[in-house]
Amino acid sequence: MRLSRYFMPTLREAPSDAQIVSHQLMLRAGMIRQEAAGIYAWLPLGLKVLKKIEQVVREEMDRAGAIEVLMPTLQLADLWRESGRYDDYGEEMLRIKDRHERDLLYGPTAEEVITDIFRAYIKSYKDLPKNLYNIQWKFRDERRPRFGVMRGREFLMKDAYSFDIDEAAARRAYNRMFCAYLNVYARLGLKAIPVRADTGPIGGDLSHEFIILADTGESQVFAHRDLVEMGAPGPDIDWDGDLEPLVQQRTRLYAASDEMHDQARFETEAPEDKRMTARGIEVGHIFYFGEKYSRPMNAKVAGPDGAERFVHMGSYGVGVSRLVGAIIEASHDEAGIVWPDSVAPFGAAVVNLRPGEAAVDAVAEQAYGALQAAGKEPLLDDRDERPGAKFASLDLVGVPWQLIVGPKGVAEGVVEIKRRATGERQTLPLDAALKAITA
């Protein structure tokens, strides 16, 4: 993409009402534009990042055996009345009437819809287990939307729902999602701590939140320090095997959000030098809730003995749009965003310091073409701007590599490369520079 033709409306200063770093930088980098309180248009740069995060989530769900569906944003109120949650959800639910006076709602979550789909088609234990997931826009009418995409009213969410014959099978599904979530966050360059959590309006018997540490986080976290350094399970685990040891390894150490914190247990279970109290951002929430939805909604299957039984369910949510802000909160500096390579909107930028000068243009085009051929999704900064302005805007939006082409370097047969994450610069022949970026 040539920056002279791209739409990237950067700002020199963030609006005064942007309170946290991620909101400020997303506005300054031209990633989003607020259209109403808690509702944002996603501009090209922001959409590229959003789509990359969505794809990482999708790949890890598929790897763990979940199956993608797409459910509607508008849902029938009658389904929520059937589950008993229509009145319980309160003012956060946006209620709508169509022209026929039928009650609808803009879905804040999808347990009812997915259970309705399941009960229409699945009738036997032989068709279990099933785990269906959906990446869709949701709406919760927050009283005080704030912090940009971190706490908006409209948000993109991945929600998965597992259906199993009994509690033991449901716990296996829960463990698969537990491990898959840790793999998602690792691929996004995040260190996530799983903590026991309150089940809230979703309900259920077992729940974990996944929290990344950030000073601006809304949650307070009490945890054993070893959890911060514990790696993700990785892609090569046996998804059909017993994952309980992997889960236990990460849950036997104390970790709790403020709602579930027990100070006496914390002091007993974690040595003083291992106790960590910090603020964090919730980036995922998983639940096992047994028959909470299947029983009132009559979602049953015939068991091996022919007798019908209610299925056991779990629910697993990741805020995809929220993750954009969370990554920025965890990875930025004074100059702007520092994206992990996995979600950067562009893999590298070729910076032409003298557009219109034939020799410089030729080397810049050569570098741009080579990076395209290598699949690096390069950006060619061919704008007629001062070098300092070019460097500042590319640092702001977080492009991981800059390959800088200027007349002096071209005359000497070299270019300069800069690694955004470290600030390290090297002067190299073009072939060596391309090799370093594409390695």
Curated annotation (Swiss-Prot):
* An individual GO BP term: prolyl-tRNA aminoacylation
Q: What is its main location?
A: cytoplasm
Q: What enzyme class is recorded for this protein?
A: ligase
Q: Name one GO molecular function term.
A: ATP binding
Reaction(s) catalyzed by this protein? tRNA(Pro) + L-proline + ATP = L-prolyl-tRNA(Pro) + AMP + diphosphate
Identify the EC number(s).
6.1.1.15
Q: Which domain of life is it from?
A: Bacteria
Q: Which Pfam families match?
A: HGTP_anticodon, tRNA-synt_2b
SUPFAM superfamilies reported for this sequence: Class II aaRS ABD-related, Class II aaRS and biotin synthetases
Q: Which residues form a coiled coil?
A: none
GO cellular component terms given for this protein: cytosol
Q: Where is this chain's protein located in or outside the cell? A: Cytoplasm
Keyword DNA-binding present in the record's keywords: the answer is no
What keywords were assigned to this record?
A: Aminoacyl-tRNA synthetase, ATP-binding, Cytoplasm, Ligase, Nucleotide-binding, Protein biosynthesis
| Function of the protein | Catalyzes the attachment of proline to tRNA(Pro) in a two-step reaction: proline is first activated by ATP to form Pro-AMP and then transferred to the acceptor end of tRNA(Pro).
Relate the assembly described in the record.
Homodimer.
For this chain, the family text in UniProt reads:
Belongs to the class-II aminoacyl-tRNA synthetase family. ProS type 2 subfamily.
Matches recorded under PANTHER family:
MITOCHONDRIAL RIBOSOME PROTEIN L39/PROLYL-TRNA LIGASE FAMILY MEMBER, PROLINE--TRNA LIGASE
Q: What is this protein called?
A: Proline--tRNA ligase
Organism listed in the record: Phenylobacterium zucineum (strain HLK1)
Quote the gene name from the UniProt entry. proS
